[in-house]
Amino acid sequence: MSLEYPEDLKYMDSHEYVRLEGEIATIGISAFAVDELGDIVFIEVPAEGEAIAQGETFGTIESVKAVADLYAPVSGTVIENNQAIVDAPEQLAGDPYGEGWLVKVRISDPSELTNALSASEYRAQVEGS
């Protein structure tokens, strides 16, 4: 199965992605991470108004296979979390880049994304091509 990695996103080594629109970063996990985790049964993300710091844990995701930490790709303040995905985590697998986003953050320093991976760089890293 070939997994998708949209070109308009930035990717992290830890498998989170960022869609940047102005100073708002939409954060989720990549199709590779969803595929590796298997059936997702629980997601915990921060509440609106909470601060997150780049590289620090901002939540957890639990599947039938494992529990994984979510790492913040950027620093900022959570302005929205995806309660629909928290309430129905199994839906994440169907659309990780669309309806499956996790949090939206007002970023404090856009330069933090300087070292993020492009779609082709991320694909090469996870697929070894």
Curated annotation (Swiss-Prot):
Coiled-coil boundaries: none
Key word Chloroplast present: no
Keyword line: Lipoyl
PROSITE patterns: BIOTINYL_LIPOYL, LIPOYL
Cofactor: (R)-lipoate
Family matches, as InterPro entries: 2-oxoA_DH_lipoyl-BS (IPR003016), Biotin_lipoyl (IPR000089), GCV_H (IPR002930), GCV_H/Fam206 (IPR033753), GCV_H_sub (IPR017453), Single_hybrid_motif (IPR011053)
A GO CC term attached to the entry: glycine cleavage complex
Keyword Glycoprotein: no
UniProt cross-references to SUPFAM superfamilies, sorted A to Z: Single hybrid motif (SSF51230)
CDD domains, sorted: GCS_H
Co-factor binding comment: Binds 1 lipoyl cofactor covalently.
Functional description taken from the UniProt entry: The glycine cleavage system catalyzes the degradation of glycine. The H protein shuttles the methylamine group of glycine from the P protein to the T protein.
Oligomeric form and interacting partners: The glycine cleavage system is composed of four proteins: P, T, L and H.
Family classification: Belongs to the GcvH family.
Protein name: Glycine cleavage system H protein
Organism: Cyanothece sp. (strain PCC 7425 / ATCC 29141)
